Amino acid sequence: MRLHHKSLCHILCGGAVVIATHPASAAFVEDSKASIDLRNFYMNRDFRSGTGQSKAEEWAQGFMLKMESGYTEGPIGFGVDAIGLLGVKLDSSPDRVGTGILQSDREAPNRAQDDYGSAGVTAKAKLSATTLHVGTLQPILPVVMRNDSRLLPQTYRGAWLQSKEIDGLTLDLGKLDRVNQRNSSDNEEMTAFNGGRRNIQFGSQTSSDEFLFAGARYAWSPELSTSYFYGGLDGIYKEHNFGLVHVLPLGDKQSFKTDLRYVHQTDDGGSNVDADAFGAMFTYKLGGHAFGAGYQQLNGDTGFAYIAGSDNSLVNLVQINDFGNEDERSWHVRYDYDFAAMGIPGLSLMTRYLSGDNVDRGPGASEGKTWERNTDLAYVFQSGPLKNLGLRLRNATTRSNFGSDLDENRFIVSYSLPLW
């Protein structure tokens, strides 16, 4: 659905009318909240190799209006949430399109639309510690993770049941039938990403209107948690996803975190998906410092499959790559610093380096190799008239003997304004 500038006001006013006229409890109104998030996004991607377009460079302003009601009284409480998304082009041209922050013009695909957006409503119900959401969803689960790395977030349409009746145990069950990509106004069927050297092939079915998921997460203690999830894109692929996270307190502002992940994927009748992914990330924290090291390995006849446009659960998913190609092995070193330790709360730095090899490039070809370097510098104002204003600079460089060589910069200014 195309969302024009006035639609944000219509959504907010409509939501306010629903709350104000609902005959139910005070909690429905008193527990409601609304906010508008502003995101100004500049992105420059320099294509260092190949012919054709030399770079992608665009600038845009995003508006995200969110409204959440409380629940009505009674054994089963009911409520409604709403979201309105609008992206406005500030700068683009036909020779610089393709950053992913703007939607392509429907009549001229080599141009970006002046604006784009969508609106969504979610009905919800709550019984004890169990909730059901039906409508627009933004899941962040091991088998399906909405992507929010550009101007506007990716959203899904479906139903999601979550239960926390047992202390420490979270159960999830759901079905998705449509996805609205981060630079789109349309709810569409889902497909699996098959770029890079994943060597994923489809039969006659290339998309699906059914993604089923179910899983459990259990916190055995404040230090240890485990998870299992099943996810399946009907007719294309299915996966079993296992995770373990342990944090060992070492005293004196020190800790050691272990993050282990294993995913087994197979086809579901309409593809050749066959992959096993193992990942491990270890992080030592000392005061404001964090030192991380990780390893990831892919085995099987294909690379890692996931819903196109989304994020995934690979430990080496970073700014540009996820190192999930067929047979790829990759390692990862990372350093973070929280400047609150120096008396500058809100300022943070992250830098990391990843290297991958052993990628299957086909019969007779040498192994594929790639590396990527990321640096993030971010600051959020903690007080004063600019409180909650965030500034973030993201830089990435990647080189490969089977893909594109890229240099990338993103500058993001964000601000969240509570409305009530």
Summary of predicted features, one role per range:
Residues 27-44, 74-80:
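Transmembrane beta-strand segments of Gram-negative outer membrane beta-barrel proteins
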Residues 27, 69-71, 124-127, 163-165, ...:
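Residue-level signature of outer-membrane beta-barrel architecture
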Residues 38-42, 132-146, 171-173, 214, ...:
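Transmembrane beta-strand segments that form the barrel wall of outer-membrane beta-barrel proteins
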Residues 34, 75-78, 129-133, 168-172, ...:
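Repeated loop/turn-to-beta-strand initiation elements of outer-membrane beta-barrel proteins
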Residues 88-90, 172-207, 253-330, 395-411:
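Outer-membrane beta-barrel translocator/channel fold
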Residues 67-100, 109-189, 216-224, 293-301:
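Outer membrane beta-barrel
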Residues 196, 214, 333, 375-381, ...:
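Outer-membrane beta-barrel "beta-signal"
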Residues 30, 55-63, 115-119, 153-157, ...:
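Residues that define the transmembrane beta-barrel architecture of outer-membrane proteins
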